[in-house]
Amino acid sequence: ILTENNVVIFETLGENFVIDLNNILKELDDYVFVTSGDLPLLDGNIVKHIVDAANSEKTWTSVITTKSFQSSLNLIPECIVSFNEENYVHTGISIVNASKIKNMNSIKEDYLIINDKRVCLNVNTNSDFKLLSTF
């Protein structure tokens, strides 16, 4: 189904997410929407919102939520970033301008704050599935 809809699938060595992603991005010369496959509520409307809201001048824009929003959904956030005296949680979604990535040097990350359950409810465990079924 994916290839029938012109979705490009990349095979990697499976070393780790960061190395695999960087190796793929070095080969591309366009904007890339990066997400994990465990966000079952991610839909076309929220993807369009993210793409429209991302700053095309930035190399890397990560979608984050406030920690308080995730806590209100009874989620236990793992990857937290702090700025402006607030705690935020990475969702695993990014918009990347791959044409600006030619090596594995550190890249300045821009943030897009979206407090929406479609970007933060993932399914990795039975407890995640049970929590998801309450929405």
Please tell me what each predicted stretch does:
Residues 1-34, 40-45:
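Short phosphate-binding loop-to-helix
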Residues 3, 131-134:
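N-terminal hydrophobic targeting segments
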Residues 14, 36-38, 65-66, 98:
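Beta-hairpin (beta-strand-turn-beta-strand) motif
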Residues 19, 127-128:
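An acidic, carboxylate-rich microenvironment
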Residues 43-127, 133:
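Conserved core of the sugar-phosphate nucleotidyltransferase
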